[in-house]
């Protein structure tokens, strides 16, 4: 896990190294301060020598200023290193998600990924900053101060030897108890983010059904779960501070009591016991030792929280894409020929029944193929295998007479344009959205594909035309308009294969027919696969595939299927009857 996260430090290695180095220098000079104070008291104040007082006073001031300067520089390096580390980590997760196949993405919810890239990374950033600064400063301070204290008076310093292990056992018990609770907290954060995301995305539906109270109740329930888990964790962590304070005050009292007795016992003779300066120095070292222990306990608490976050981050970073480029990939797709050769597919390999079962299919380049089937008949699953969004479980799929697994994935997908069931537009102008298909497309190219998709007729009515700003998710355009813009975007790719996954369901039949006519006239060499609920959308196709429960029940033209396929005929007649009733 540490090795995985450390890879995100990269260009901030210098700051990551310099922060502990300057912290070590800060501690070195800070450790010298009590020794100089002892000299100032014993040789200057007790002897009434102003020259010695000035001498050690100036040295003390210089050492303190150097220590302060090193501390400030260390803080600057730590801030740069931790912020840069978090930035790189956020980028690494984001880039990793872009590489995921659909199968990988299915493992993580959107809300979970958002939590990992925000809350979890913030926790790791804070822990990283504490590790390269405080987690370095505190142990060095502890060891050096203990060494100096033992050098002054070994017997008194045995107090620390008893206190520190007791403190360590207590901290370990707290860590083991709290870590599982924080794991539950961050999983609940995923659920909370999912509820917020779902509510905001569907806010119009929520309001139209007056379900605000129900949504508030869902939110409150999850929020209360987070509250209860956090309170439980904090109640356990609360023992950390009393434990530290008990150790601090016990050590201070024992040092004061035993140290004072030692000074009195020697009767002022420094050769026989502890001098006043040494006692003050020992007391200062006591404070340094105990403060370093307190800071270490804070680091441990932060690490407890960050550990749960780090595990969640590494879960994403260590996820390997289920789709890999072959060692010697094919970069050119010759044509739009498609062949399904005994294809079996399942999203879950342990599933009892495959989603697609022994599918055999031949499509020639330039053909228009219709796909008809009921809900859950695996129409979308069928076409998602063509651009290799998923890999087949058995069999093979050929595009341009080459197995899709032998292609360079990017090259294959550049030749397959797919308009998914769920049409997505991004915030930006219409032009910016359409140029997802071709970033170098001219205004003339954009207008041409919009004419093919029958989108130009409504775009021209907008005051800003193609520069009209699309809100996030395309909320300021209708469903039919969104579908036509998505079709235009796909056409800009100039693909060899065009797949429309129920992508004209929100447009009227007249516009649907106009789009299909434009396809036949303008892109005759492109293989067109049209998934539709309306038979009218596919009845002119060269072939119509009838799917049912993941199996091809019939293939043929409209007239042939009306004679040979009961399923197709029933769908056609029910839609025809519905149309007649509406008239």
Role assignments for model-derived ranges:
Residues 33, 37, 74, 78, ...:
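Hydrophobic/aromatic residues in alpha-helical transmembrane segments
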Residues 11-13, 99-103, 119-132, 136, ...:
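An intracellular "coupling" helix at the cytosolic face of ABC transporter transmembrane type-1 domains
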Residues 331-583:
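ABC-type nucleotide-binding domain
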Residues 49-53, 148-163, 171, 232-311, ...:
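Helix-loop-helix
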Residues 10, 16-73, 77, 150-155, ...:
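Transmembrane helix-loop-helix hairpins at lipid-water interfaces of multipass membrane proteins
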Residues 47, 83, 91-115, 119-121, ...:
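Short intracellular "coupling" helices and adjacent cytoplasmic loop segments at the cytosolic face
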Residues 20, 24-32, 65-72, 124-127, ...:
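Hydrophobic alpha-helical transmembrane bundles that constitute the permease/transmembrane domains
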Residues 1-13, 113:
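A short amphipathic helical element positioned immediately N-terminal to and/or at the very start
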């Amino acid at each position: 896990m540490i090795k995985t996260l450390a890879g995100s430090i990269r260009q901030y290695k210098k700051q990551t190294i310099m922060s502990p180095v300057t912290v070590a220098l800060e501690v070195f000079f800070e450790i010298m301060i009590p020794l100089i104070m002892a000299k100032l008291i014993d040789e200057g104040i007790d002897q009434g020598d102003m020259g010695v007082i000035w001498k050690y006073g100036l040295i003390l001031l210089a050492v303190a200023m150097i220590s302060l300067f090193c501390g400030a520089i260390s803080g600057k390096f730590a801030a740069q290193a931790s912020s840069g580390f978090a930035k790189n980590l956020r980028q690494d997760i984001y880039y990793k998600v872009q590489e995921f196949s659909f199968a990988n993405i299915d493992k993580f919810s959107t809300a979970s990924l958002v939590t990992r890239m925000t809350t979890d990374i913030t926790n790791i950033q804070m822990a990283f900053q504490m590790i390269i600064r405080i987690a370095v400063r505190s142990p060095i301070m502890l060891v050096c101060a203990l060494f100096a204290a033992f050098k002054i008076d070994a017997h008194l310093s045995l107090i620390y030897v008893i206190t520190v292990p007791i403190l360590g056992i207590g901290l370990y018990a707290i860590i083991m108890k709290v870590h599982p609770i924080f794991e539950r907290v961050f999983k609940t954060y995923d659920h909370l983010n999912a509820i917020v995301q779902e509510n905001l995305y569907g806010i119009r539906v929520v309001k139209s059904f007056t379900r605000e109270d129900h949504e508030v109740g869902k939110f409150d329930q999850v929020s209360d779960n987070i509250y209860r888990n956090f309170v439980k964790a904090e109640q356990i962590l609360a023992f950390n501070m009393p434990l530290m304070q008990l150790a601090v005050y016990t050590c201070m009292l024992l040092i004061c009591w035993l140290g004072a007795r030692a000074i009195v016992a020697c009767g002022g003779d420094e050769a026989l016991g502890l001098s006043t300066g040494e006692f003050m120095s020992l007391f200062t070292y006591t404070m340094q030792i105990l403060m370093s222990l307190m800071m270490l306990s804070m680091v441990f608490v932060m690490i407890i929280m960050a550990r749960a976050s780090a595990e969640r981050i590494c879960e994403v970073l260590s996820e390997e894409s289920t789709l890999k480029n072959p060692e010697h990939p094919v970069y050119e797709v010759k044509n739009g020929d498609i062949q399904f050769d005994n294809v079996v597919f399942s999203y879950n390999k342990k599933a009892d029944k495959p989603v697609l079962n022994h599918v055999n299919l031949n499509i020639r380049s330039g053909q228009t193929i219709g796909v008809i089937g009921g809900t859950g008949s695996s129409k979308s699953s069928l076409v998602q295998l063509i651009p290799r969004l998923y890999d087949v479980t058995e069999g093979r799929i050929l595009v341009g007479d080459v197995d899709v697994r032998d292609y360079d994935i990017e090259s294959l997908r550049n030749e397959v344009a797919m308009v998914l069931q769920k049409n997505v537009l991004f915030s930006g102008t219409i032009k910016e959205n359409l140029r997802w298909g071709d970033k170098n497309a001219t205004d003339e190219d954009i207008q041409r594909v919009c004419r093919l998709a029958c989108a130009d007729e409504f775009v021209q009515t907008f005051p800003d035309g193609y520069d009209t700003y699309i809100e996030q998710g395309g909320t300021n355009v209708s469903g039919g308009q969104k579908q036509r813009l998505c079709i235009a975007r796909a056409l800009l790719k100039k693909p060899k294969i065009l797949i429309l996954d129920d992508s004209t369901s929100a447009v009227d039949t007249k516009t649907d027919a106009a789009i299909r006519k434009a396809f036949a006239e303008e892109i005759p060499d492109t293989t067109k696969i049209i998934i539709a609920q309306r038979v009218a959308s596919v009845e002119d196709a060269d072939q119509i595939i009838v799917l049912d429960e993941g199996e091809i029940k019939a293939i043929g033209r409209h007239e042939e299927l009306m004679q040979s396929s009961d399923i197709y005929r029933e769908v056609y007649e029910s839609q025809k009857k519905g149309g007649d009733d509406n008239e």
